[in-house]
From Swiss-Prot:
InterPro entries: Aldolase_TIM, DAHP1/KDSA, KDO8P_synthase. Pfam families: DAHP_synth_1 (PF00793). It comes from Xylella fastidiosa (strain 9a5c). It is found in: Cytoplasm. This is 2-dehydro-3-deoxyphosphooctonate aldolase. The gene is kdsA. The lineage of its organism: Bacteria, Pseudomonadati, Pseudomonadota, Gammaproteobacteria, Lysobacterales. One of its GO terms (molecular function) is 3-deoxy-8-phosphooctulonate synthase activity. Its EC number is 2.5.1.55. GO terms for cellular component: cytoplasm. Keywords: Cytoplasm, Lipopolysaccharide biosynthesis, Transferase. The keyword Transferase applies. Signal peptide: none annotated. It catalyses: D-arabinose 5-phosphate + phosphoenolpyruvate + H2O = 3-deoxy-alpha-D-manno-2-octulosonate-8-phosphate + phosphate. Disulfide bonds: none annotated. GO terms for biological process: keto-3-deoxy-D-manno-octulosonic acid biosynthetic process.
């Protein structure tokens, strides 16, 4: 499958979707995107910048949600033109999807909305590549009918993204078998290494996270075999305005990606026995 001008799949090198969880300021987005572009260019890693203009599912009603649609799209367009990278953002049921699609290169559907049939179809009908996040409450094989809904619009540029499964209260677990199961959708599989270590609502009015396990799960997923890695990053995670506890520090992103690129090459060199 071609995505933003490059090929993705198990027979292609790993690609990266990364950026701050939410748009905090124009300068933060430009600086972060610039650092990520420099790192990925050195590694020969295809890169899509990600950030949200509205976080609609915050734990607390008083938490920062983002700058909103109008200002958010201006920031994403600035990143796209000034840094020279494709951009991704998530949309919601109330979002004017056509307007967002005039700026961004990839649309993303939130995990909590994965079962909303009309929403999935409406997003995919725009014709842009779509990254569909698997709900924390959904089994990996249940992504097959979701993809069928998506592709019924005539859009074949569909990615499926694993971001962990609910494991009791305030916890997520990553079953690496799901990455192989989700390949059966016929779509490139992306692993979200940062939301997978989230502890939803675990800090009372906000979610916690265990960012120390981001490289652990990222290495495991790449060793299983994935098309892309999703990782939210921030120059100062403790002071990030959204999902700081599970954001990977920007200053150590290069070291993490160097390891993953090497591991990806080894994993894909001989193919996958489970597909024989």
């Amino acid at each position: 499958m071609k995505l933003c001008g490059f090929e993705v799949g198990l027979n292609q090198p790993l690609f990266l979707i990364a950026g701050p969880c939410v748009i905090e300021s124009l300068q933060l987005q430009l600086d972060t995107a610039g650092v990520l572009k420099e790192i990925t260019s050195k590694l020969g890693l295809n890169f899509i910048f990600k950030s949200s203009f509205d976080k609609a599912n915050r734990t607390s009603g008083s938490s920062f949600r983002g700058p909103g649609l109008e200002e958010g799209l201006k920031v994403l367009e600035a990143v796209k033109t000034q840094i020279g990278v494709p951009v991704l953002t998530d949309v919601h049921e109330y979002t004017p999807i056509d307007e967002v699609a005039t700026v961004v290169d990839v649309l993303q559907t939130p995990a909590f909305l994965v079962r909303q049939t009309d929403f999935i179809r409406n997003v995919c009908a725009v014709g842009k590549p779509v990254n569909i996040k698997k709900g924390q409450f959904l089994s990996p094989w249940d992504m097959k009918p979701v993809v069928e809904k998506a592709k019924s619009t005539g859009n074949s540029q569909i990615l499926v993204c694993e971001r962990g499964a609910s494991f009791g209260y305030n916890n997520l677990v990553s079953d690496m078998r799901s990455l192989a199961v989700m390949r059966e959708t016929g779509c490139p599989v992306v692993f979200d290494a940062t939301h997978s270590v989230q502890l939803p609502g675990a800090q009372g009015g906000r979610s916690g996270g265990q960012r120390e396990f981001v490289p652990v799960l990222a290495r495991a997923a790449v060793a299983v075999g994935i098309s892309g890695l999703f990782a939210e990053t921030h120059p100062d995670p403790p002071n990030a305005l959204s999902d700081g506890p599970n954001a990977w520090p920007l200053h150590t992103m290069a070291m993490l990606l160097e390891t993953l690129v090497e591991l990806d090459a080894v994993t894909k060199k001989r193919g996958f026995l489970e597909q024989d």
